[in-house]
């Protein structure tokens, strides 16, 4: 009897590790860029497949970035030092208009993706690519689809349309056939990311922004890993993918607290220090003995400043344009003014009847469950039914109810005008902004106390 012995050599398939460092909702906070750059460089010394993603909202929040001569340029210069590989646009990227956004994209070494951002012919902004591919040395191809929230100020981008991100993503299901790993790089918020994962199982990972959510270990929805890393560059996200035979066999996420890191990239930190040293933002222009406890107190100050600047009876400011939730007692600097409101919206003067003012307020409430229009010159009460629907708005000034037959001078910024005054005759646009009005107001009122100020009431019928 003959026995044949067959030898089988088992070749174990090698695995590849991919690391994606991500940031979202930085809003001009540049102080930790030195630490981030050092951290990324250390990872790249350890392994070859390290990428850096930006999930939107680079600007609006720090005057050294927002008020630079070339608006937004400092943060792009710092990003290029890291460097970033892929970016999606946040809604705030559109706040400086189409031409400035185009200049920032041209300045950046990062690839910008935005599948649902559509530019009309003649726009200074040119369509970004909807997606891009990253290829590993083993041949694995990673597809990255970009999606952006539609909550920008449409009046600033008349030639750009931002269409529904989830519906748009569904049109790119075929992208999965062209890559082995598929990532959505989004600025649509955690809830929308969850909806996207539910409706479209093609994504292995969604790297998100917009809602400023901290997801310490990420969340799994429909087998998709959803990540987000807070805001203001306090953290970076670290997504790790384990790939075997060109397919993901493991994925995980952690948030890295940059404030706990000690190593700093010297070149990047010198650039950060250069920008932070800008002297004009350190000038003290006022003080507040009790501070501001909430947005309404800050918004009331801003509305008073707008009313004074435009010489009107009534003025409104929007909660979206108050970037601080509260403000401590003490000095107020020029930098603080541009942090409280970082938008540079022009101020507009209208002549409105009480009925038209009610319509303005009612429209604003339909977009939010809470009052969002802070006011000067009057108080108003929202009268709601048990379902929370506004049935009436009462308006009073210091003399009592407004005269229904009179037109009042009313001031507001272009954001409020664009969203709630579409069907009204255009107002008179001025060169003033909320920031300049605040600076002028503090020249005449260097000490401001708005503690306990409340001009809005809600009454249930």
Locate the predicted segments by residue.
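Bacterial Sec-dependent N-terminal signal peptides
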Residues: 1-16
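Catalytic centers of hydrolytic enzymes
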Residues: 16, 23, 29, 45, ...
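Short, motif-level signal for alpha-helix interfacial/capping segments enriched in acidic residues
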Residues: 2, 6, 34-35, 188, ...
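General secondary-structure edge motif
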Residues: 1-2, 58-59, 156, 221, ...
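Acidic, metal/ion-coordinating pockets
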Residues: 14-264, 297-305, 351, 366-373, ...
């Amino acid at each position: 009897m003959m026995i044949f012995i067959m030898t089988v050599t088992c070749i174990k398939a090698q695995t590849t590790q991919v690391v994606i460092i991500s940031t979202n909702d930085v809003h001009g906070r540049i102080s930790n860029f030195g630490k981030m750059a050092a951290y990324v460089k250390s990872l790249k010394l350890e392994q070859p497949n390290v990428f850096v993603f930006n999930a939107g909202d680079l600007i609006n929040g720090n005057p050294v970035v927002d008020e630079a001569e070339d608006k937004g340029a400092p943060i792009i210069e710092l990003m290029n030092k890291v460097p970033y590989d892929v970016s999606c646009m946040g809604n705030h990227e559109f706040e400086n208009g189409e031409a400035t956004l185009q200049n920032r994209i041209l300045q950046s070494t990062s690839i910008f993706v935005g599948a649902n951002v559509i530019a009309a012919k003649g726009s200074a902004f040119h369509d970004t690519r909807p997606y891009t591919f990253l290829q590993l040395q083993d041949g694995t191809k990673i597809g990255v689809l970009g999606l952006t929230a539609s909550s920008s100020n449409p009046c600033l981008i008349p030639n750009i349309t931002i269409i529904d991100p989830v519906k748009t993503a569904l049109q790119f299901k075929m992208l999965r056939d062209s890559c082995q790993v598929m990532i959505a790089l989004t600025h649509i918020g955690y809830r929308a990311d969850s909806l996207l994962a539910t409706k479209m199982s093609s994504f292995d990972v969604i790297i998100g922004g917009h809602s400023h959510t901290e997801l310490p270990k990420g969340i799994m929805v429909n087998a998709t890993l959803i990540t987000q890393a807070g805001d203001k560059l306090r953290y970076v996200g670290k997504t790790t993918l384990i790939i075997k035979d060109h397919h993901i066999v493991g994925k995980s996420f952690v948030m890295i607290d940059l404030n706990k890191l000690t190593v700093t990239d010297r070149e990047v930190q010198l650039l950060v220090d250069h920008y932070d040293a800008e002297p004009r933002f350190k000038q003290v222009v006022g003080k507040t003995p009790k501070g501001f406890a909430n947005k309404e107190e800050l918004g009331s100050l801003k509305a008073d400043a707008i009313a004074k600047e435009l010489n009107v009876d009534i003025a409104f400011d929007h909660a979206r344009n108050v970037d601080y939730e509260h403000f401590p007692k003490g000095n107020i600097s020029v930098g603080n003014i541009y942090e409280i409101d970082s938008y540079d919206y022009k101020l507009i003067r209208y002549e409105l009847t009480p009925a038209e003012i009610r319509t303005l307020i009612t429209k604003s409430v339909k977009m939010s469950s809470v009052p969002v229009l802070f006011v000067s010159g009057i108080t108003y009460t929202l009268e709601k039914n048990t379902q929370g629907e506004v049935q009436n708005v009462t308006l009073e000034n210091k003399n009592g109810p407004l005269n229904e037959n009179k037109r009042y001078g009313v001031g507001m910024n272009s954001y409020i005008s664009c969203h709630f005054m579409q069907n009204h005759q255009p107002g008179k646009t001025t060169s003033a902004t909320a920031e300049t009005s605040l600076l002028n107001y503090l020249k005449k009122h260097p000490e401001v106390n708005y503690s306990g100020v409340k001009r809005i009431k809600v009454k249930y019928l």
